Amino acid sequence: MFTLSYKINTSPQTSDSYSTYNDMHAATDWEDFLKRLYDLNNDGSQNTTEHTFQADYTTPIGKIHTLEAGAKYILRDNSSEDDRYERQIGTTGDYVLDEEHSSHYKHQNDILAAYMGYGLRVKKISGRLGVRYEHTKQEVKYLLGRGDDFNKNFDDVVPSASIGYKLTDMSNLRFGYNMRIYRPGIWYLNPYLNDSNPTNISQGNSHLDSEKSHSFNLSYSNFTQKFNINLSARYSFTNNSIEQVTEQVKDTEIEGLQNPTGKEVLYSTYQNIGKSRNASLSGYVNWNATSNTRIYANLYGNYTYMEGANGLKNDGWNLFAYGGAQQSLPHDWRISLNIYGQTPWIMLQGKGSSFFDYGLSVNKSFLNKRLTLSAFASNFFKKYTSPTSSIEGVGFTQDSWNRYTRQRFGVSVSYRIGELKASVKKAARTISNDDVKSGGGEGGGGGE
């Protein structure tokens, strides 16, 4: 089978924040620090656009062998425009663009990958070996603000292997190894110096390398008409993980900071300094209670040990739970209820926040199920959430509190064109780009 695929994806984000000062008082030795402050308006926009081209070929050889090969080309363009406006404290005039301390930045990744795989199936035993080569061309341009343009190239060989055993017609046991590459997203890379809080300054790092993670996984699955169960145990390690690093430094040491005074402030950025070890257990259960009722749950527990090249260490547990129910009603109505939550997540210098959310959706189908109208709402009894985080370093402890809304309300409309027939075969390979490390918004630059 030969498959050609194309996918386009774009993720625009905007931010607009204001920092103003009133009734400022300070000890005598901090008066110079107060004089450098301005009312600020940070107007930012970030965007990532991906074009992916993929070709896959799979062929059986005899009854027990399978060969596969393919290639993928990703054009990933990251862009960020952060404009800084300021005005004198205590005035009501217009904000004026500070072009010197604004930042317009482009980061382009061209990724070319090719893979080969071999599969074997003998009675109840199956196995697979694979290898993938990736070449990454990275180009960084500073269109406005401080920074030197540069280019970097990476070459990686990514192996994988797995073996499975068919316990029964409905259950399987599988063990596998794979290496994964996680490239930093725009929030990690954005070099904009965010000093809207002059005592807690943050900035991304455009010189970050990709993470390389190695993982071993043992899984058990069982599928019946009533129950679907999947259990897995996993161990992974990374020797160059991207971690947020917060230090207490004199503001004169921060390159590009406007009017430094020599006072000590907190400075956060990202570095490839981390060594992480993760052991996890997870389980998924789906119960078809009746022909119209489905109940499902997903549980995940993870123990993490982290160590930085600067001597920092941290470890701890993190738990995540997701569950819900779906009920089909007469006249093509369907209702779904979901709940999910997580305990505080572990960082190199502290821990993040826990959360608990819930959501409800209602769907109605028309025109022989061609047209579907949906309405959804999440956290409708809780308008605001107040996440916290804690960071510790040499000579300081930082506790952060935020408050924002997590309520979501929406509607959607979908219409199916054409007929769904059993003779229409689904592609064996589809495009999945999961190589970008998520997160990074808290400590990086780019507005708030």
List where the protein language model places each region.
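Repeated loop/turn-to-beta-strand initiation elements of outer-membrane beta-barrel proteins
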Residues: 1-2, 64-67, 124-127, 170-173, ...
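Transmembrane beta-strands of outer-membrane beta-barrel pores
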Residues: 8-14, 59, 73-77, 122-124, ...
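Surface-exposed extracellular loop regions of Gram-negative outer-membrane beta-barrel proteins
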Residues: 18-20, 39, 50, 109-148, 169-214, 235-262, 378-394, ...
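Outer membrane beta-barrel strand-and-loop segments of large Gram-negative receptors
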Residues: 41, 50-54, 96-102, 205, ...
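Residues on the lipid-exposed face of transmembrane beta-strands in outer-membrane beta-barrel proteins
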Residues: 53-59, 114-120, 161-165, 218-222, ...
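Conserved C-terminal beta-signal and adjacent last beta-strands/turns
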Residues: 314-448
